[in-house]
Protein backbone atom coordinates (compact mmCIF):
# COMPACT_ATOMS: atom_id res chain seq x y z
CA UNK A 1 0.00 0.00 0.00
CA UNK A 2 1.25 3.46 -0.86
CA UNK A 3 1.69 6.01 1.94
CA UNK A 4 -1.19 8.16 0.71
CA UNK A 5 -3.66 5.28 0.20
CA UNK A 6 -6.32 4.79 2.85
CA UNK A 7 -6.83 1.47 4.62
CA UNK A 8 -10.31 -0.04 4.93
CA UNK A 9 -10.30 1.08 8.56
CA UNK A 10 -9.46 4.64 7.48
CA UNK A 11 -12.25 4.52 4.91
CA UNK A 12 -14.74 3.43 7.59
CA UNK A 13 -13.62 6.28 9.86
CA UNK A 14 -13.99 8.66 6.93
CA UNK A 15 -17.51 7.44 6.37
CA UNK A 16 -18.43 7.91 10.03
CA UNK A 17 -17.14 11.46 9.93
CA UNK A 18 -18.77 12.22 6.61
CA UNK A 19 -22.07 10.88 7.95
CA UNK A 20 -21.89 12.82 11.21
CA UNK A 21 -20.49 16.04 9.74
CA UNK A 22 -22.48 15.88 6.53
CA UNK A 23 -19.63 16.41 4.06
CA UNK A 24 -20.40 14.84 0.72
CA UNK A 25 -22.92 12.33 -0.63
CA UNK A 26 -22.95 9.23 1.60
CA UNK A 27 -24.71 7.12 -1.05
CA UNK A 28 -21.72 7.55 -3.35
CA UNK A 29 -19.43 6.47 -0.52
CA UNK A 30 -21.37 3.18 -0.20
CA UNK A 31 -20.90 2.65 -3.92
CA UNK A 32 -17.13 3.10 -3.58
CA UNK A 33 -17.23 6.47 -5.33
CA UNK A 34 -15.85 9.83 -4.24
CA UNK A 35 -18.54 11.45 -2.04
CA UNK A 36 -17.28 14.99 -2.67
CA UNK A 37 -19.27 16.75 -5.44
CA UNK A 38 -17.58 16.97 -8.83
CA UNK A 39 -15.96 20.28 -9.61
CA UNK A 40 -17.84 21.08 -12.81
CA UNK A 41 -19.32 24.42 -11.76
CA UNK A 42 -17.62 27.25 -9.90
CA UNK A 43 -19.61 28.15 -6.79
CA UNK A 44 -20.25 31.82 -6.06
CA UNK A 45 -22.20 33.65 -3.37
CA UNK A 46 -25.16 33.55 -5.77
CA UNK A 47 -25.07 29.75 -6.22
CA UNK A 48 -26.79 29.01 -2.91
CA UNK A 49 -30.06 30.79 -2.16
CA UNK A 50 -30.06 31.45 1.56
CA UNK A 51 -26.51 32.31 2.64
CA UNK A 52 -26.08 34.85 5.39
CA UNK A 53 -23.17 37.06 6.44
CA UNK A 54 -20.84 36.12 9.27
CA UNK A 55 -22.59 37.32 12.45
CA UNK A 56 -21.16 39.99 14.73
CA UNK A 57 -20.56 37.27 17.32
CA UNK A 58 -17.40 35.66 15.96
CA UNK A 59 -13.75 35.09 16.79
CA UNK A 60 -10.71 35.59 14.58
CA UNK A 61 -7.73 33.23 14.80
CA UNK A 62 -4.39 33.86 13.11
CA UNK A 63 -3.14 31.00 10.94
CA UNK A 64 0.15 30.41 9.17
CA UNK A 65 -0.52 27.42 6.97
CA UNK A 66 0.87 26.95 3.48
CA UNK A 67 -1.17 25.17 0.83
CA UNK A 68 -0.35 24.48 -2.78
CA UNK A 69 -1.53 26.41 -5.81
CA UNK A 70 -3.20 23.19 -6.97
CA UNK A 71 -5.18 22.97 -3.72
CA UNK A 72 -6.35 26.58 -4.01
CA UNK A 73 -7.35 25.85 -7.61
CA UNK A 74 -9.56 22.99 -6.40
CA UNK A 75 -10.97 25.05 -3.51
CA UNK A 76 -11.87 27.90 -5.87
CA UNK A 77 -14.46 25.61 -7.46
CA UNK A 78 -16.24 25.57 -4.11
CA UNK A 79 -18.48 22.88 -2.68
CA UNK A 80 -22.04 22.67 -3.98
CA UNK A 81 -24.13 20.06 -2.14
CA UNK A 82 -25.75 17.40 -4.30
CA UNK A 83 -27.96 15.82 -1.62
CA UNK A 84 -29.57 16.65 1.73
CA UNK A 85 -26.91 14.61 3.57
CA UNK A 86 -24.30 17.13 2.51
CA UNK A 87 -24.53 19.88 5.11
CA UNK A 88 -21.93 22.27 3.67
CA UNK A 89 -21.83 24.89 0.93
CA UNK A 90 -18.51 26.59 0.20
CA UNK A 91 -17.27 29.19 -2.22
CA UNK A 92 -14.14 31.30 -2.60
CA UNK A 93 -13.85 34.88 -3.65
CA UNK A 94 -10.61 36.74 -4.38
CA UNK A 95 -9.01 36.16 -0.96
CA UNK A 96 -11.45 34.24 1.25
CA UNK A 97 -12.72 30.65 1.59
CA UNK A 98 -16.29 30.71 3.00
CA UNK A 99 -18.10 27.70 4.49
CA UNK A 100 -21.84 27.79 5.20
CA UNK A 101 -24.25 25.24 6.62
CA UNK A 102 -26.27 24.34 3.55
CA UNK A 103 -29.65 23.95 5.28
CA UNK A 104 -29.61 27.22 7.22
CA UNK A 105 -27.21 29.35 5.18
CA UNK A 106 -25.33 30.32 8.34
CA UNK A 107 -21.72 31.30 7.71
CA UNK A 108 -19.52 29.16 9.97
CA UNK A 109 -15.99 29.80 8.64
CA UNK A 110 -14.26 32.50 6.61
CA UNK A 111 -10.56 32.00 5.94
CA UNK A 112 -8.31 34.62 4.36
CA UNK A 113 -5.55 33.46 2.02
CA UNK A 114 -2.67 35.22 0.28
CA UNK A 115 -0.21 34.30 -2.47
CA UNK A 116 3.14 33.26 -0.99
CA UNK A 117 5.78 32.46 -3.59
CA UNK A 118 4.52 29.55 -5.69
CA UNK A 119 1.95 28.58 -3.06
CA UNK A 120 -0.65 30.22 -0.84
CA UNK A 121 -0.95 30.82 2.89
CA UNK A 122 -4.06 30.60 5.01
CA UNK A 123 -3.62 33.60 7.29
CA UNK A 124 -6.78 34.27 9.29
CA UNK A 125 -9.78 32.14 10.23
CA UNK A 126 -13.03 33.79 11.36
CA UNK A 127 -15.33 31.42 13.27
CA UNK A 128 -19.04 31.92 13.98
CA UNK A 129 -19.80 32.20 17.70
CA UNK A 130 -23.50 33.06 17.58
CA UNK A 131 -25.07 30.32 19.77
CA UNK A 132 -28.30 30.57 17.77
CA UNK A 133 -26.41 29.64 14.60
CA UNK A 134 -23.52 27.40 15.64
CA UNK A 135 -22.72 25.39 18.74
CA UNK A 136 -18.93 25.35 18.46
CA UNK A 137 -17.12 26.63 21.54
CA UNK A 138 -13.63 25.13 21.26
CA UNK A 139 -11.21 27.08 19.05
CA UNK A 140 -8.89 24.11 18.55
CA UNK A 141 -11.81 21.88 17.52
CA UNK A 142 -13.05 24.53 15.09
CA UNK A 143 -9.64 24.98 13.47
CA UNK A 144 -9.34 21.20 13.18
CA UNK A 145 -12.82 20.85 11.65
CA UNK A 146 -12.04 23.62 9.17
CA UNK A 147 -8.80 21.86 8.20
CA UNK A 148 -10.71 18.58 7.82
CA UNK A 149 -13.13 20.28 5.43
CA UNK A 150 -10.24 21.70 3.38
CA UNK A 151 -8.26 18.44 3.26
CA UNK A 152 -11.36 16.43 2.32
CA UNK A 153 -12.32 18.94 -0.35
CA UNK A 154 -8.99 18.59 -2.15
CA UNK A 155 -8.96 14.79 -1.89
CA UNK A 156 -6.24 14.52 0.75
CA UNK A 157 -5.88 11.85 3.43
CA UNK A 158 -7.99 13.34 6.19
CA UNK A 159 -7.85 10.40 8.64
CA UNK A 160 -5.29 11.92 11.01
CA UNK A 161 -7.05 15.27 11.22
CA UNK A 162 -10.31 13.43 11.92
CA UNK A 163 -8.64 11.51 14.75
CA UNK A 164 -7.38 14.81 16.17
CA UNK A 165 -10.87 16.28 15.97
CA UNK A 166 -12.38 13.29 17.79
CA UNK A 167 -9.69 13.49 20.47
CA UNK A 168 -10.43 17.18 21.09
CA UNK A 169 -14.16 16.48 21.38
CA UNK A 170 -13.53 13.57 23.76
CA UNK A 171 -11.29 15.74 25.97
CA UNK A 172 -13.99 18.43 26.02
CA UNK A 173 -16.59 15.88 27.11
CA UNK A 174 -14.30 14.62 29.88
CA UNK A 175 -13.74 18.18 31.16
CA UNK A 176 -17.50 18.75 31.30
CA UNK A 177 -17.91 15.64 33.49
CA UNK A 178 -15.34 16.85 36.04
Feature-to-residue mapping (PLM):
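Intrinsically disordered, low-complexity segments enriched in small/polar residues
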Residues: 75, 89, 97-101, 118, ...
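Contiguous mid-protein beta-loop-alpha structural module that forms a pocket-lining wall or clamp
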Residues: 2-3
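A structural signal for the main folded, soluble domain(s) of proteins
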Residues: 70, 79, 92-94, 117-123, ...
